[in-house]
Amino acid sequence: MKYSYLLLILLLSNLYKEGFSQGQPDSIVLSATIYDESPIVTDFEIETYYNGVVEGIVQPDLGADGTPVYCCGDSPVTENGRIVVHNQSTFYSWFHSVPGVNVPIPYDLTLTRVGDSTYAYQSNSFFPIDGNGFDNSTVYPNEPHYLGHNFHFCMKIHYSFTYHGGEYFTFSGDDDVWVFFDDVLRIDIGGIHTAASRTVNMDDLGLTVGQSYPWDFFYCERHTSQSTLNIITNLNFTCSAYDACGVCDGHNDTCCMVNQCSESPINPCLIQACGPDNNYQCEFVDKICNTTNDKCLVESCEIGFGCLAIPKNCNDNDPCTTDHCDPAIGCYYDKFDNCDACNAVDTCITNDLCFPRECNPRGNPPCLINPINCTSTDPCIFSYCENGVCIPTYICTPTPSVTPTVTPTVTPTVTPTVTPTVTPTVTPTPTTTPTPSPTTVPPRPTPTPLPADPPPYDLEEGCLVCRDLDCEKTGKSCTYLENETIRLFECKGVGCCKYTPTCY
């Protein structure tokens, strides 16, 4: 009887385990936030770096905002005389949204069931955001790229688990990895290094059966040339709340990417705006040009040209002053001694707003002409005055991104001369344009506008053409301006028009 009773218990136990296993999903999706970092930022793609695991970069307790706390304030973490992390300011951008420094991107990390209640993610080539964020050459044409992949990003995941006994978590990969269980650091394999492994057994943490505990995972890929991420665990992950972007315990900082606000408009005078003020919807607002500290220049954004800077008009219309401009302070005026202001209304009439006339208090000549200065700081922009307003004109000859004399149709599979995936996408030097003698100064570009018809041979189908503008109705001609945003990169599809038609 006792023997039969034991067999019954064993049978029921096996049936329970089988039923529990059959009730498990085939996969678990962990919603994550990835912060794509520019390799120009100091902590990423460090030129002279220490190759090895470095512990102690972060403090043992999770920060109040749910992210790791940097160990050392404004001081760097070094190993063998080489910098591992520069300071708390550079470290902050690893797991916080910082406009202009990183790009938050939502990502789903899918773990697949490999046992009764065991799930795994295994990748020796973990590149989840290739072509996104700073790796998008159309949106960020000046960002360097390495070996065909986006190697520079950090990822954070926040979930909870209920402790039943026997749970474990194993990680293997590179580079920095910190995992907190119940807000305490249990896996610490920081630094730039080859794949390293750690395992945490929940039975060793003094947890209470049936109670839920937070689990926080932080991972960074900071250097070429490998990216490995392997996870094996039987933790039963749960999420208490999702943010507006669908990220567990998120902060809504990836919503703009969800709404595709990373797409760059053809109009260079519009920029993306997305945030809580507009319910995380993508909007385009006017670009504010702020490229110079010269107070003698006035900046404005012109469609087809982008930001332009022309000399400030310091004319105070006072014939008893001499007008000046200092780049540091702007306009200033010297008053004439013993000057009697004259009346220019009757004697010095302005017939052309580009050449305003004013009376001469010294009497000879009776009128002075102060032409409006429309000189542009860009050698490819010729600005002229029309009705008192400076009008910019593009005078440089656009250079086709594929030189016709190479006859690209003969060998279409030839490797392009610009390879962003091998070397950083620094502006390449054209090889087909004649180079002036080193002892001479290259001449100023001469106006050579492209014809209105036919359109440029490499203009994508669906892009605007001169016929759409109908410039002739206004008595003007039409030409095509090269789109500087994508001039140096291969680009296909919507929003990748290499030229923009404009009236002149």
Swiss-Prot record:
Q: Which UniProt keywords apply?
A: Glycoprotein, Secreted, Signal
Compositional bias (Pro residues) at which positions? 431-453
Span-the-membrane segments of this chain are: none
Signal peptide boundaries: 1-21
- Which positions does UniProt annotate with glycan attachment? N87, N136, N236, N252, N290, N373, N483
Tell me its family. Belongs to the prespore-cell-inducing factor family.
Output this protein's name: Protein psiD
Q: Tell me which species this is from.
A: Dictyostelium discoideum (Social amoeba)
